[in-house]
């Protein structure tokens, strides 16, 4: 009986999450959700929101103005990210071109000078709901962006523990 040579091989190419995600049905649903939220927010701020803001006390009206600006900024970042990812999915942009676009429009991870919750509580419920929805969507997109990002280090190849044990046996027993 001859010596059996066992080798650990993993020659499968690494699956890049970003490339597969932007082509998935999940991304299409996320895209629709994001763009729908942008449209709903624009319709609200141009219609009922404008009317509701006129009924607010002065301090609440100032909070309304600052929170609606934060909301639209957050939604512009979301829409920009979604459009870049869709362009990658449809072959209009390469991953490297998308990375360049990412440096132009950054997803902010923190919002400075956020209004106190007690002030936000005085805002119309419709605006509060849009703010909450946009924050949840923004958090999801930040998470996805970190997963897709090429900034993560490439994992180093690992030696198979089975191969190492087999090698020790081969050395010990020839």
Model-derived segments and spans:
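Surface-exposed peri-terminal alpha-helical interaction modules
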Residues: 2-174
